[in-house]
Amino acid sequence: MRILGIDPGTLVVGYGIIETANDELTLVGFSSLTPPACAPIPQRLAYIYKGLVEVIELYQPDEVAVESPFADKNIKSALAIGKAQAVALLAAANHSLPVTEYSPACIKSRVAGSGNASKEQIQEMVRLLLNLAEIPQPNDAADALAVAICHHSQRAFTNIISQGDLT
């Protein structure tokens, strides 16, 4: 199974693609989309949409996983991220791809074993789980790979539960 993970944002959108087979994870690719920072939001969103469509058509994922925005103190930032998230959902939907959204705490828990894991811990776990020499750069791409790994972990857990094999 090929999973596209997306870390949405209006300034940088990270994406990462992994392949899973027999519980083994293989890195397929990763990068980021960086719309012009001076462009108005609608143009940035169009840039992100076009870029994600190109990624989907190039890598042909089976499923898409997207990080959901976290609204702590900066509501304006969360709303902007939500717009980029909506564009990611639209790109996947227009390609008939199943999409799952994950909260930052869920991603941290699934990847590092703790919903309170630091960004550095998550990035190191991404490096270890994908058997990489270095942490993927930019950070947004490493975060997107964490989203994809989270989705793989959640799917594996759901499969175990659905089969009734809790031993």
Swiss-Prot record:
Residues at which Mg(2+) 2 binds: 67
Cofactor binding: number and manner: Binds 2 Mg(2+) ion per subunit.
UniProt keyword list: Cytoplasm, DNA damage, DNA recombination, DNA repair, DNA-binding, Endonuclease, Hydrolase, Magnesium, Metal-binding, Nuclease
Active site positions, chain numbering: 7, 67, 140
GO biological process terms held by the UniProt record: DNA recombination; DNA repair
Record has Cytoplasm as a keyword: yes
Cellular location(s): Cytoplasm
Class of enzymatic activity (EC top level): hydrolase
PROSITE patterns noted in UniProt: RUVC
Single annotated GO MF: magnesium ion binding
GO CC annotations on file: cytoplasm; Holliday junction resolvase complex
CDD domains cross-referenced by the UniProt entry: RuvC
Assigned EC number: 3.1.21.10
Annotated Gene3D superfamilies: Ribonuclease H-like superfamily/Ribonuclease H
Binding-site residues for Mg(2+) 1, renumbered to this chain: 7, 140
Cleaved signal peptide residues: none
A Pfam family per the record: RuvC
Catalytic activity, reaction form: Endonucleolytic cleavage at a junction such as a reciprocal single-stranded crossover between two homologous DNA duplexes (Holliday junction)
Cofactor: Mg(2+)
Family: Belongs to the RuvC family.
Subunit annotation: Homodimer which binds Holliday junction (HJ) DNA. The HJ becomes 2-fold symmetrical on binding to RuvC with unstacked arms; it has a different conformation from HJ DNA in complex with RuvA. In the full resolvosome a probable DNA-RuvA(4)-RuvB(12)-RuvC(2) complex forms which resolves the HJ.
Known function: The RuvA-RuvB-RuvC complex processes Holliday junction (HJ) DNA during genetic recombination and DNA repair. Endonuclease that resolves HJ intermediates. Cleaves cruciform DNA by making single-stranded nicks across the HJ at symmetrical positions within the homologous arms, yielding a 5'-phosphate and a 3'-hydroxyl group; requires a central core of homology in the junction. The consensus cleavage sequence is 5'-(A/T)TT(C/G)-3'. Cleavage occurs on the 3'-side of the TT dinucleotide at the point of strand exchange.
Name of the featured protein: Crossover junction endodeoxyribonuclease RuvC
Gene source species: Dehalococcoides mccartyi (strain ATCC BAA-2100 / JCM 16839 / KCTC 5957 / BAV1)
